[in-house]
């Protein structure tokens, strides 16, 4: 379930397989034992009122500076549906994203996360961490390898591999003369196509993860703003070592 709004119990063929209490995240349930192969299956999503559920937690008071819809703070759903300055109150409910049945390989990537550890702005050399989690049958460990590829505009920039010996591991890429990601007005927001593949000993690709990655560092340089005028405080974002002027409106 890519999106359930918001409080729901899920049933498959008359069996309760799970529940949802958060509009903002995906929900996945293992239905291996409940699903009937080659037959019709009945999937039911029973929704409960987010308003009624939230009202169970009310204290009976609210700030006159806020909308009188304090039940919204107890439920993980879009708060603007309870009434906002841009639209009237219309509390929604239902499936707001796709529902799909996934058949998963017992040997697969379960999570891939990229983190820029360091950027040398003078040489544009970048150290990129790739944190990987996998699900593998025990006998596959030490026989399967992870292959890492980084490309830009269809051109392969980096390729490497490592043997998988544990369900969670980190791989470090050293990228030379990289195209850095910059915010608007400071340069090109360059993106790379990053791919991780699980490859069996016979060359079979068991699982693939594709993402787009920007190579940059972002820091917040902050000091106490309640200082005398001759020592003003600081609140500044630093991207790739360069102070960035943040502008915009709400």
Where are these regions (language model features)?
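Secreted/periplasmic carbohydrate-active enzymes, especially glycoside hydrolases
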Residues: 1-250
């Amino acid at each position: 379930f890519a999106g359930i709004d918001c409080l729901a119990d899920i049933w498959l063929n008359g069996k309760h397989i799970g529940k949802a209490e958060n509009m903002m995240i995906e929900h996945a349930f293992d239905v291996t034992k409940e699903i009937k192969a080659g037959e019709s299956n009945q999937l039911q999503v029973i929704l409960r009122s987010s308003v009624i559920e939230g009202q169970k937690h009310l204290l009976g008071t609210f700030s006159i500076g806020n909308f009188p819809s304090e039940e919204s703070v107890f439920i993980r759903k879009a708060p603007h549906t309870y009434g906002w300055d841009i639209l009237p109150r219309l509390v929604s409910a239902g499936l707001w994203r796709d529902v799909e049945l996934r058949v998963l390989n017992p040997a697969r990537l379960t999570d891939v996360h990229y983190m820029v550890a360091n950027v040398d702005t003078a040489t544009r050399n970048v150290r990129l961490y790739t944190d990987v989690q996998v699900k593998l049958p025990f006998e596959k460990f030490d026989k399967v390898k992870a292959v890492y590829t980084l490309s830009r505009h269809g051109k392969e920039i980096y390729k490497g591999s490592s043997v998988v010996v544990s369900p969670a591991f980190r791989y470090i890429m050293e990228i030379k003369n990289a195209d850095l990601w910059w915010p608007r007005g400071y340069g090109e927001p360059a993106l790379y196509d990053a791919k991780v593949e699980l490859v069996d000993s016979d060359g079979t690709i068991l699982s693939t993860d594709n993402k787009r990655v920007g190579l940059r560092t972002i820091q917040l340089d902050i000091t106490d703003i309640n200082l005398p005028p001759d020592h003003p405080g600081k609140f500044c974002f630093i991207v790739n070592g360069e102070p960035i002027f943040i502008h915009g409106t709400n």
